[in-house]
Amino acid sequence: MAIHDELLAAVDGKRGVDAADRLCEACVTLFDVDAAAISLVFDGANSGTLGSSGEPARQYDELQFILGEGPCLDSVSSRAPVLVVDLADLDEARWPVYGPAMLDLKVRGVYAMPVLVAGEYIGALDLFRAQPRRLEDHHFAGAIAAAELASLPLLDLLDTDMQAAFGDPNSDAWADLHTLSRAEVSQATGMLVAQLGIEPAEALVRLRAHAYATGRSATDVARDILDRRLRLGEED
C-alpha cells in the first residue's frame, strides 16, 4: 500500500482531534520518527496542539509555545518545510533556547511541514527524532502529503469559526475553538489585557515568561490566572 493510501486509511472514519491523533501516529510508523504533532498557529504564535502521537510530542510542542521559537513557527512564517537533521550541529543553531531544551529531552532531529487551509498557513506538522538522520526522500514526500491531510481535521474543528477568525483577528471565534488544548491561554491572555491595560502580544509574552521562569507549562499558568490563583503584576 502506498504511503498516501496508508495515511488516508489512518484517518478514515475519524474526525477532528481523533483524526489528527491518528494521523500523527501513522507518521511515526511510516516515516521512522519518534514523535509527531500537528500545531495550530495564529498571528505568529503557536496557539494549540491539534493532535499528537503521544505525551512526548505534546511536550515538544509546548516548548515552542512557551519559548516562542521552533520549527513549527518557522515553517508557518516561511511557508516552507523546515528540516533540521541535528540540533547539536553548531551550524543549525537557529533556536538559541528551543534547540538546547530539545537536546536536553534527547531529541536531535526536528522537521516541520506547513499546513495550508483556505489559502492561509495556519499550522504545521512537526516530526521529531532522537537520532540525527536526514529524512529519506520518500519519507519527506509522505510528510508533505500528511501535512495536506492535516487540513481535514482542522477544517472539522474550525468550520465557520475559521472564516470569522481570519476575517477579524479580534474575533471571539478563536476563543470558541475550545477543543484545542490551549484555549485557556487565549482566555488568560485576554484577562491580562484587561487587568494590566497592555496589548495582547505583551500579555502573551508575560504569560510565557512566567511559565518559563517557574518551570511550568503555559497552560497551567493560564489556568491559575483564570481561576484567580495567580495575578501577574507590572514586574512580571
Briefly describe each language-model feature range.
Residues 1-67, 223-236:
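Intrinsically disordered, low-complexity terminal regulatory regions
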Residues 35, 99, 112, 124:
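Short hydrophobic/aromatic beta-strand element in the GNAT-like acyltransferase core
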Residues 41, 57-94, 100-108:
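Regulatory sensory and allosteric helical modules in signal-transduction proteins
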Residues 87, 124-133, 138, 155:
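Short beta-strand-to-loop transition segments that serve as allosteric relay/switch motifs
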Residues 109-116:
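Short hydrophobic beta-strand micro-motif common in sensory/regulatory domains
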Residues 140-152:
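Allosteric cytosolic regulatory segments
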Residues 159-236:
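Signal-transducing coiled-coil/dimerization helices and immediately adjacent hinge/linker segments
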